[in-house]
Amino acid sequence: MAFLKLTEQNVQGKTVLIRADMNVPFKDGKISDDTRIRASLASVKYCLDNGASVIVMTHLGRPTEGEFHPEDDVAPVAAHLGGLLGKDVKVLNDWRENKPALNAGDVVMLQNVRINKGEKKNDLELGKAYASLCDVFVNDAFGTAHRAQASTEAVAQAAPVACAGVLMAGELDALGKALKQPARPMVAIVAGSKVSTKLTILESLADKVDQLIVGGGIANTFLLAEGKAIGKSLAEHDLVEESKKIMAKMAAKGGSVPLPTDVVVAKAFAADAEAVVKDIADVAEDEMILDIGPKSAAALADLLKAADTVVWNGPVGVFEFDQFAGGTKALTEAIAQSKAFSIAGGGDTLAAIAKFGVTDQIGYISTGGGAFLEFLEGKELPAVAALEKRGE
């Protein structure tokens, strides 16, 4: 992927506009998790350390375009960013009428981009208005890279220079390494409740990987495709044929979709449900599969330890309940111990990594939910395509 990087730009004496993803959650009016703000600090600090002034823009929540309500205000985000930087970060509400006059070292924030008319429709005039504020535009919002919007795509077309921020460049380099020229053997884990939501990812990865591990409700549908009885487990009967095709595709190239031979079942989906380990052939009609069994977990762990590239999206069991967390824990630890380059993404996956305390042992943890999935599907990400075009 050919794109310019912020860290290769001379920003001395320039105004840099950074599109960040600081869409943080709030609880009782306070920021409850500042991970996204902290993730954006590297680009802001690079600019400040190299003599630039910085304008940050982000979206927050899902406001109605053209309307402004108190809950849409980015002021708490600006205040938090200021606290982390040790600076006063002012919010600019009327930046179109009053273009800011900034000095090196200044940091300001534009009001929530999603209240601007034309933002979601990728309005070119709005993109030009953003671009008119800066000498250099930086996209550091990988989490929104799959959306063509004025603050991610149109602005990149119109700005004097458009480049990828530290976070964005890191994401793209890691994803490129994992998917464009992977070291082999390559293993992917795709898990979740439904095949339907991950079907295009499964099909796309089946072309690339040597082993395709499936988990959760997805694995149940594949077990059905193998003719196994799964009791009252969550599955999609209408996607059994698609599952058979994916298994045939993997087998034809000497790979496989290794399915569990033993499972952990319960009579109910509940935190206090009794967990029973069973051979896959012994699952009763009134039982549901909520995790893979210890034999299956050990076999899959061996596959992961022997891999050179691992792409991971989704836990293989209901890991929120400890009695059904064994499979996900075993695979998480195997990935952490493996010599493979590993990349993980998706909210549940990140929660599992945090729960089992291996955050520092995963090669790369992607910050983009939808963008990560669309990259796995092989789709073009509009905001990235815009950067690549400007990098030519």
Curated annotation (Swiss-Prot):
<dbReference type="InterPro" id="IPR015824">
    <property type="entry name" value="Phosphoglycerate_kinase_N"/>
</dbReference>
<keyword id="KW-0808">Transferase</keyword>
<dbReference type="GO" id="GO:0006096">
    <property type="term" value="P:glycolytic process"/>
</dbReference>
<dbReference type="InterPro" id="IPR001576">
    <property type="entry name" value="Phosphoglycerate_kinase"/>
</dbReference>
<dbReference type="GO" id="GO:0005524">
    <property type="term" value="F:ATP binding"/>
</dbReference>
<keyword id="KW-0418">Kinase</keyword>
<feature type="binding site">
    <location>
        <begin position="346"/>
        <end position="349"/>
    </location>
    <ligand>
        <name>ATP</name>
    </ligand>
</feature>
<feature type="binding site">
    <location>
        <position position="114"/>
    </location>
    <ligand>
        <name>substrate</name>
    </ligand>
</feature>
<dbReference type="GO" id="GO:0043531">
    <property type="term" value="F:ADP binding"/>
</dbReference>
<feature type="binding site">
    <location>
        <position position="198"/>
    </location>
    <ligand>
        <name>ATP</name>
    </ligand>
</feature>
<comment type="similarity">
    <text>Belongs to the phosphoglycerate kinase family.</text>
</comment>
<keyword id="KW-0963">Cytoplasm</keyword>
<feature type="binding site">
    <location>
        <begin position="21"/>
        <end position="23"/>
    </location>
    <ligand>
        <name>substrate</name>
    </ligand>
</feature>
<feature type="binding site">
    <location>
        <position position="320"/>
    </location>
    <ligand>
        <name>ATP</name>
    </ligand>
</feature>
<keyword id="KW-0547">Nucleotide-binding</keyword>
<keyword id="KW-0324">Glycolysis</keyword>
<feature type="binding site">
    <location>
        <position position="36"/>
    </location>
    <ligand>
        <name>substrate</name>
    </ligand>
</feature>
<dbReference type="InterPro" id="IPR015911">
    <property type="entry name" value="Phosphoglycerate_kinase_CS"/>
</dbReference>
<feature type="binding site">
    <location>
        <begin position="59"/>
        <end position="62"/>
    </location>
    <ligand>
        <name>substrate</name>
    </ligand>
</feature>
<comment type="pathway">
    <text>Carbohydrate degradation; glycolysis; pyruvate from D-glyceraldehyde 3-phosphate: step 2/5.</text>
</comment>
<dbReference type="GO" id="GO:0006094">
    <property type="term" value="P:gluconeogenesis"/>
</dbReference>
<dbReference type="GO" id="GO:0004618">
    <property type="term" value="F:phosphoglycerate kinase activity"/>
</dbReference>
<feature type="binding site">
    <location>
        <position position="147"/>
    </location>
    <ligand>
        <name>substrate</name>
    </ligand>
</feature>
<keyword id="KW-0067">ATP-binding</keyword>
<dbReference type="Pfam" id="PF00162">
    <property type="entry name" value="PGK"/>
</dbReference>
<dbReference type="InterPro" id="IPR036043">
    <property type="entry name" value="Phosphoglycerate_kinase_sf"/>
</dbReference>
<comment type="subunit">
    <text>Monomer.</text>
</comment>
<protein>
    <recommendedName>
        <fullName>Phosphoglycerate kinase</fullName>
        <ecNumber>2.7.2.3</ecNumber>
    </recommendedName>
</protein>
<dbReference type="GO" id="GO:0005829">
    <property type="term" value="C:cytosol"/>
</dbReference>
